[in-house]
Amino acid sequence: MPKEENALITLTNAGIRRDRKWLVRGITMSVNSGEIVTLIGPNGSGKTTTAKIALGLLGINEGTTSRKNNLRIGYVPQKLQIDWTVPIKVKRFISLTHKISDKEIEFALSLTNTSHLSDKEIRVLSGGELQRVMIARAIALSPEFLVLDEPVQGVDYKGEDAIYNLIEETRTKIKCGILL
């Protein structure tokens, strides 16, 4: 396990229970700057729950969690909850919930090779294009810690390879810790 004193996030024997059932238990891990940590397991094994614990979105019933103070986090959820009838263009979508400069948006779109999509509506994007735009949205926040939950879900084989290459390039260029 990586050095915990420099970790962006650390989980130690973390567990979360609903009613009498443990969703995950005994999770110990840390993520440092510039490293990629991948959660592997079948559907329903607790990967998303573990990611949400690391993000601080779910409280734990046992164990401990710690995060670097003022940690900047980017998050790409497994499923996007959006009203597809609302016409919203990519550039606006990226800055929808945070004040982000045009320069930051352009950098994120360029890094994810989606600059050509900036004036397209979200609802017309392919699965791979949407995933890359979602990653651009997270990158635009200049995260130190980036969490991507099932980043290649709904993407064809060729698109999967492109997204994994993008994740590696993101780690290299912005030096963030990444949890997949």
Predicted features, each with a name:
Residues 14, 102-119:
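Conserved ABC ATPase "signature" region
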Residues 55:
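Helix-to-loop junction immediately C-terminal to a conserved catalytic motif
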Residues 121-125, 129:
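Conserved ABC ATPase signature
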Residues 135:
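Hydrophobic anchor residue at the start of the ABC signature
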Residues 142:
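Conserved catalytic motifs of ABC-family nucleotide-binding domains
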Residues 146-150:
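Catalytic Walker B motif of ABC-type/P-loop ATPase nucleotide-binding domains
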